[in-house]
Amino acid sequence: MTKHLPTISDISPLLKAEILAEALPYIRAYHGKTIVIKYGGNAMVEERLKESFARDVILLKLVGMNPVVVHGGGPQIDEALKKIGKTGTFIQGMRVTDEETMEVVEWVLGGEVQQDIVMLINHFGGQAVGLTGKDGGLIHAKKMMIPSDAEPGKKIDIGFVGEIEAINPAVVKALQDDAFIPVISPIGFSAEGQAYNINADLVAGKMAEILHAEKLVMMTNIPGVMDKDGKLLTDLTAREIDALFADGTISGGMLPKISSALDAAKSGVNSVHIIDGRIEHSLLLEILTEQAFGTMIRSR
């Protein structure tokens, strides 16, 4: 039986008013601060959640915060690959990306998905601008080789998958200063102009670090980080995360997500959260209320 996930219609008018009143100190505290949001999962697929997300981002901008959206698009890439008879393959949470897959990734992320997000934000009254790593030299990347689990010391070539060498935040800051909302596709480029597919969690974490963000919020399809019994872990330190890596509790697609979140926390991002994007207005609930939500990642 599918568990009912709350929507805004489940909340009484009185509670809505209380939430607005509760938001005031957070609006003051985060005014002028940068909030980096990794947008992915069901929140990018279901129309109700897509509209909820767009409205949330616009509201954050209207009350004086500087939201920066870094989006994924795994399901959309898988669907596009399926149409040309290809199946996605992942190693350690990273998509193996041959030349044909890279062309699909560029088209889906930098085109279809990004345009959908930008158009939706603009439709509801915001001013969003889409970016890829090529725009303004935003994301400089090089080929990633990942360590083999089976053969220590050996590196695995997973194709046109990149790791971030540097981020030039000038174009993002310029857009923020002009009241725009940057929407960033996780595609990096080498000095030779080669495009690389970069995990969106890694881009979001590095962007939060470089922009000296107050918060990094990662939206997922689960309530947060779960233990082996399915219980939500609401607060994790670096030492606890290392233990979860070692015993296999954190694996697959969660590996780059948690690693990126922890790196951001260590770099000085004040608050790093992994939240359930399936809940309507989860972004506002995380940023503007006292409600403990999802998993907080701390460096110590």
Curated annotation (Swiss-Prot):
Pfam entry (one): AA_kinase
Any one cellular-component term (Gene Ontology): cytoplasm
Subcellular location: Cytoplasm
Single Gene Ontology BP annotation: L-arginine biosynthetic process
Any one GO molecular function term: acetylglutamate kinase activity
Record: residues binding substrate: G73, G74, R95, N197
EC number(s) per entry: 2.7.2.8
Main localization, broad class: cytoplasm
Alphabetized UniProt keyword annotations: Amino-acid biosynthesis, Arginine biosynthesis, ATP-binding, Cytoplasm, Kinase, Nucleotide-binding, Transferase
Reactions catalysed, as given in the entry: N-acetyl-L-glutamate + ATP = N-acetyl-L-glutamyl 5-phosphate + ADP
Annotated site (Transition state stabilizer): K38, K257
Gene3D superfamilies, alphabetized: Acetylglutamate kinase-like
Family that this chain belongs to: Belongs to the acetylglutamate kinase family. ArgB subfamily.
Function comment: Catalyzes the ATP-dependent phosphorylation of N-acetyl-L-glutamate.
Protein name: Acetylglutamate kinase
Organism in which the protein naturally occurs: Polynucleobacter asymbioticus (strain DSM 18221 / CIP 109841 / QLW-P1DMWA-1) (Polynucleobacter necessarius subsp. asymbioticus)
Annotated gene: argB
